């Protein structure tokens, strides 16, 4: 594609038109020898994002060496509660937002480069990213999209040709992330903590206009905005729980206003079912354990509510009362979504008797530390008569046989055909997830041997997570004891 076409990309950088206190204007720091590794051509097509023709041009574009014409690179400022402790200034310490790309239908996409160099928010960091975390985010964010989970997306991965130094020298990389925006609860906290409620109002008006313009007609747009963010987060966390996803670092700076999953640093997927599962090496007290994710999301939303109080009502007492009522609504809404998601995993309608069935199944799984993903996937086969793959996952097989009988009674009560129940199960129980050991194997091959074939193969398999792919059966399997990943690291 020639330079003239590339130069007229339809950027409309609305965030850059906000006051300068919201960001630092800064260009990506060039890298020496960029090499394109992956380009998500399917996503580029959906966005109508024009790609250069040669690998060299792609590498220059997605490394940040030659930002597209029309972009206005900047680093966003935000604060955040990290593991419950407030940090008054964080911000994009290694990321640069190129701008907002707008498709012909008017859909707006943030395009951000991670690992693009130092900014004023780098806090003594080098602004770069090692290759490993870039591979992890590419694999997992695209898998999450295919699994039906709201998420940021991966557009490209570039090796920088430079080393970055952590505990050791590692190959560097730049990741291109696409999001509907990068506005976080922590963005609101930055201004509220400085008593800059003019900034909070500007940000709230901007977020409403960008994400939820219909709320401008509400009687109290700011209360409605808080309610909407609570709703999208309730839906998101319920979907995480359905697939056994553990984010690992649910700080307020990693909680989006849009309801998209963002920042895949120490994330992981549950192997053996245990609601207390934690993977992140820095989560010493299990704050962000699998089962705690809903309550942490609500805690984060209470932080957003605190920022919005002066906008919700001029009387502090009335503002608190209204905000509390909205945030308290998160619990029931989450439970409704979670129950529906989990019922779909066993092919039944979300009716009251199913609650006990679900509780019993999870208890049996917990007792056996049965693999979360495989147990649910094999339920469908067991229901149709092939119980062996399911029974192999459990220590006490009589319990699971007894459970299957109860399930069948409830199915009959709901008047659902077995085949229909199994179809529902297979649409909601993935055969393939980015298993932690497979992701680590892909990273090791790339970092140690410059071999990206395992990464590409894993991405290909995860493109169809709900389909049987017999030729890749080994990718369905839980890790062997020697392969098991017990801790994950942010790594950036």
UniProtKB/Swiss-Prot annotation:
Q: Which residues bind ATP?
A: 91, 93-94, 114, 126-127, 177, 184, 263
Catalytic residues of the enzyme? 253 (proton acceptor)
Instruction: Report the catalytic activity.
Output: L-seryl-[protein] + ATP = 3-O-(5'-adenylyl)-L-seryl-[protein] + diphosphate; L-threonyl-[protein] + ATP = 3-O-(5'-adenylyl)-L-threonyl-[protein] + diphosphate; L-tyrosyl-[protein] + ATP = O-(5'-adenylyl)-L-tyrosyl-[protein] + diphosphate; L-histidyl-[protein] + UTP = N(tele)-(5'-uridylyl)-L-histidyl-[protein] + diphosphate
| InterPro entries xrefs | SelO
Select a single GO molecular function from the record's annotations and give it: AMPylase activity
The entry marks the following residues as binding Mg(2+), namely: 254, 263
For this protein, the record's Pfam families field holds: SelO
Keyword check for DNA repair: no
What cofactor does its activity depend on?
Mg(2+); Mn(2+)
Q: What class of enzyme is it?
A: transferase
Keyword line: ATP-binding, Magnesium, Manganese, Metal-binding, Nucleotide-binding, Nucleotidyltransferase, Transferase
Q: Which NCBIfam families match?
A: PRK00029.1 (NF000658)
Describe the function of this protein. Answer: Nucleotidyltransferase involved in the post-translational modification of proteins. It can catalyze the addition of adenosine monophosphate (AMP) or uridine monophosphate (UMP) to a protein, resulting in modifications known as AMPylation and UMPylation.
Q: What is this protein called?
A: Protein nucleotidyltransferase YdiU
């Amino acid at each position: 594609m020639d330079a003239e076409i590339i130069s007229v990309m339809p950027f409309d950088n609305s965030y850059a038109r906000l006051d300068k206190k919201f960001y630092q204007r800064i260009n990506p720091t060039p890298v020496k020898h960029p090499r394109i590794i992956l380009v998500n051509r399917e996503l580029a097509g959906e966005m109508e994002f024009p790609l250069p023709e040669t690998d060299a041009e792609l590498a220059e574009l997605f490394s940040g060496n030659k930002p597209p014409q029309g972009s206005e690179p900047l680093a966003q400022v935000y604060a955040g509660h990290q593991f419950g402790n407030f940090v008054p200034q964080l911000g994009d310490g290694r990321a640069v937002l190129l701008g907002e790309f707008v498709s012909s239908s008017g859909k707006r996409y943030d395009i951000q480069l991670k690992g693009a160099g130092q900014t004023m928010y780098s806090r003594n960091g080098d602004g770069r990213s090692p290759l490993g975390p870039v591979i992890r985010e590419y694999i997992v964010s695209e898998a999450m999209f295919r699994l039906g989970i709201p998420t940021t997306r991966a557009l490209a991965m570039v090796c920088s040709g430079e080393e970055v130094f952590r505990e050791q020298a590692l190959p560097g990389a730049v990741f291109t992330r696409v999001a509907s925006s990068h506005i976080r609860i922590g963005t609101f906290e930055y201004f509220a903590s400085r008593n800059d409620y003019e900034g909070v109002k500007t940000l709230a008006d901007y977020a409403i206009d960008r994400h939820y313009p219909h709320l401008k007609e509400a009687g109290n747009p700011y209360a409605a905005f808080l309610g909407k963010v609570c709703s999208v987060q309730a839906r998101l966390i319920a979907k995480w729980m359905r697939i056994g996803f553990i984010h690992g670092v649910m700080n307020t700076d990693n909680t989006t206003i849009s309801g998209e999953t963002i920042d895949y640093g120490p994330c992981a997927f549950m192997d053996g079912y245990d609601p207390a599962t934690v993977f992140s090496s820095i989560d010493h007290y299990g704050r962000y354990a699998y089962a705690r994710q809903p309550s942490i999301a609500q805690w984060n939303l209470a932080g957003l509510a605190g920022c919005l109080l002066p906008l919700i009502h001029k009387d502090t007492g009335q503002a608190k009362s209204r905000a509390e009522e909205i945030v308290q609504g998160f619990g029931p809404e989450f439970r409704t979504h979670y129950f529906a998601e989990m019922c779909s995993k066993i092919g039944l309608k979300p009716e009251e008797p199913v609650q006990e069935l679900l509780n019993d199944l999870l208890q049996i799984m917990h007792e056996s530390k049965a693999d979360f993903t495989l147990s649910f996937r094999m339920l469908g086969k067991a229901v149709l008569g092939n119980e062996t793959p399911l029974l192999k996952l459990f220590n006490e097989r009589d319990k699971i046989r007894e459970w299957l009988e109860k399930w069948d009674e409830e199915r009959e009560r709901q008047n659902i055909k077995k085949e229909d129940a199994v179809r529902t199960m297979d649409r909601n129980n993935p055969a393939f997830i980015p298993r932690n050991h497979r992701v680590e194997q892909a990273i090791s091959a790339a970092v140690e041997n410059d071999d990206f074939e395992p990464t590409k193969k894993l991405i290909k398999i995860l493109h169809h997570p709900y389909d049987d792919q017999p030729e890749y059966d080994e990718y369905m399997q839980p890790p062997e004891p020697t392969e098991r990943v017990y801790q994950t690291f942010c790594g950036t």
